[in-house]
Amino acid sequence: MKFFMVLLPASLASTSLAILDVESGLLPQLSVLLSNRLRGKTCQTGP
């Protein structure tokens, strides 16, 4: 039972870290895509 009580928080921490890692990887890409879209709309140079 003690092992399970140690394993559960560890797995929760690792999953939350993985989610944070994915978000920190996706957010810059989304901001770059949005800025490129806005720039393209204002300059009419791309799709």
UniProtKB/Swiss-Prot annotation:
Leader sequence residues: 1-18
Protein name: Putative glycosylation-dependent cell adhesion molecule 1
Tissue-by-tissue expression: Expressed in cells harvested from milk of lactating women. Not found in other tissues.
Signal listed as a keyword: yes
One GO cellular component term noted in the UniProt record for this chain: plasma membrane
Assigned protein family: Belongs to the PP3/GlyCAM-1 family.
Keywords: Signal
